[in-house]
Amino acid sequence: SLLEFGKMILEETGKLAIPSYSSYGCYCGWGGKGTPKDATDRCCFVHDCCYGNLPDCNPKSDRYKYKRVNGAIVCEKGTSCENRICECDKAAAICFRQNLNTYSKKYMLYPDFLCKGELKC
């Protein structure tokens, strides 16, 4: 769920999911269109695509469990949906950490109307 994802993001990046990633660029937050603005926004695009591959799951509300083993995120065994949601969130949180050096405050609260076009997963 968004609760676990937010916790993962904080652990990986040291940033609060809200406001740091809740409306960043064209893809971080609800919906998305256009070309990702930077590597962080691309992480969100890939995360949206990952969720899009889970049509029978509820990624924003389905809870899952994970732990840390030697600093690494390990998704704990749950239902098929829980496992796949956790893996999507894990990949995004790691992607955010790997791209912290290019995170730009100018893309926080980025206006939707500047995001044009369609990008296929």
Swiss-Prot record:
InterPro entries: PLipase_A2, PLipase_A2_Asp_AS, PLipase_A2_dom, PLipase_A2_dom_sf, PLipase_A2_His_AS
Reactions it catalyzes: a 1,2-diacyl-sn-glycero-3-phosphocholine + H2O = a 1-acyl-sn-glycero-3-phosphocholine + a fatty acid + H(+)
Enzyme Commission identifier(s): 3.1.1.4
Bridged cysteine pairs (disulfide): C26-C115, C28-C44, C43-C95, C49-C121, C50-C88, C57-C81, C75-C86
Gene Ontology CC: one annotated term: extracellular region
Matches recorded under PROSITE patterns: PA2_ASP, PA2_HIS
Cofactor(s) the record lists: Ca(2+)
UniProt-listed SMART domains: PA2c
Keyword annotations: Blood coagulation cascade inhibiting toxin, Calcium, Disulfide bond, Hemostasis impairing toxin, Hydrolase, Lipid degradation, Lipid metabolism, Metal-binding, Myotoxin, Neurotoxin, Presynaptic neurotoxin, Secreted, Toxin
Family recorded in the similarity comment: Belongs to the phospholipase A2 family. Group II subfamily. D49 sub-subfamily.
Subunit structure: Monomer.
The protein's name: Basic phospholipase A2 VRV-PL-VIIIa
Lineage: Eukaryota, Metazoa, Chordata, Craniata, Vertebrata
